[in-house]
Structures are given as structure tokens and as C-alpha cells.
């Protein structure tokens, strides 16, 4: 609770990361998952902060994104879950029918300092689309004030490497013997 004022200030401050984000590294604990982790630049720091993204089974509709900072022991400041089990906000002041929150949802701290799952208005507009990384990740970035390369838009994101056309160098000049007049 002592850090809550600093936390609120940090959450309202723009945070920047490199763009585009390419989620391509194999996760050591889960070989079928891809991950990305990168530090954030922030004018008002809250410990060392970074962004972490995991895409399971290379499925853009099964991802989680986290805003992390070591100023909290749990490190998780904000988390977006696009798929998986419902989350239960097991608190007496939340009515039982409202305690279960299906995916997609965002975990964020409320005014009482509890990390709870919520569906934002943007998620509720189209929950199926918000489950995908192309729509869900910008929603996460908006909640966390995360931008790409000193811009005011969320960073571009892609899963896996873009395919490349192989280049094979040949030892002959295709223009050899052609007269250019």
C-alpha cells in the first residue's frame, strides 16, 4: 500500500518499447510456446520494468501479455489473458455471479490493491476479436500506456519470423555479352 501512489503514477506514465515486437523465441519451459521479453523506457520508473509476451502453440488466439516491474514482489503489474480458464475474483465484496471472469480479460490492481480480472469496455465490444493478438495486444497496451518507439500508438506485433525468399548467389552475370546502347 505504501507504493500505491508510485504505482498509480507509473501506470499513467507512457512506457516505450522497440517496435515491431516479434514473438519468436522458444520458451525453455514450454517448447511449443514462443516468447518475447524486452525492457521498457519510462520517465517515471517503478523499479526495472519490462514487457513479456507468450504465444502458445504459435496460436495468435492463445497468448498472454504482461507488464512486469521488480518494485512488486510478484512483479506482475498488468496481465492480459486471451484464452484459457476463467479467473475467479474470490473477494467477499464482489457478488458471487460476478466473481467468474471468462477470457479474454485483463488482470489489474484495483483501488484496494488487489490483482483482479476484469473485462474492459474494449474487450466487451468484440470478445472473439479481442482474443486475437492483433486486437487484444493493443487493448493491453492501452491499459498499460505502452507505446512503440517514442510514438503514441501501440507497438506493432507479429508472431514468428516473416518468411523470406531464399537467395542463392550464382557465379555468372546474366547481363554478360548483352550490348546496352
Tell where the protein language model's regions lie, with residue ranges.
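Generic low-complexity segments that are intrinsically disordered, proline-rich and/or Lys/Arg-biased
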Residues: 15, 21, 29, 40, ...
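An exposed acidic His-Trp-rich patch
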Residues: 64-127
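Acidic, proline/glycine-rich low-complexity IDRs
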Residues: 133-181
Amino acid at each position: 500500500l505504501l507504493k500505491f501512489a508510485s504505482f498509480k503514477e507509473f501506470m499513467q506514465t507512457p512506457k516505450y518499447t522497440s517496435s515491431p515486437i516479434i514473438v519468436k523465441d522458444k520458451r525453455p519451459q514450454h517448447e511449443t510456446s514462443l516468447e518475447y521479453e524486452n525492457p521498457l523506457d519510462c520517465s517515471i520508473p517503478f523499479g526495472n520494468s519490462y514487457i513479456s509476451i507468450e504465444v502458445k502453440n504459435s496460436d495468435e488466439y492463445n497468448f498472454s501479455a504482461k507488464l512486469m516491474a521488480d518494485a512488486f514482489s510478484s512483479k506482475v503489474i498488468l496481465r492480459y489473458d486471451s484464452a484459457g480458464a476463467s479467473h475467479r475474483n474470490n473477494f467477499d465484496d464482489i457478488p458471487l455471479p460476478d466473481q467468474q471472469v471468462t477470457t479474454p480479460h485483463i488482470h489489474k490492481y484495483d483501488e484496494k490493491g488487489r490483482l483482479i480480472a476484469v473485462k474492459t469496455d474494449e474487450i466487451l465490444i468484440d470478445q472473439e476479436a479481442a482474443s486475437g493478438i492483433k486486437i487484444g495486444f493493443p487493448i493491453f497496451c492501452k491499459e498499460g500506456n505502452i507505446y512503440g518507439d517514442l510514438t503514441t500508438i501501440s507497438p506493432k506485433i507479429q508472431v514468428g519470423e516473416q518468411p523470406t525468399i531464399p537467395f542463392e548467389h550464382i557465379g555468372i552475370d546474366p547481363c554478360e555479352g548483352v550490348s546496352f546502347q
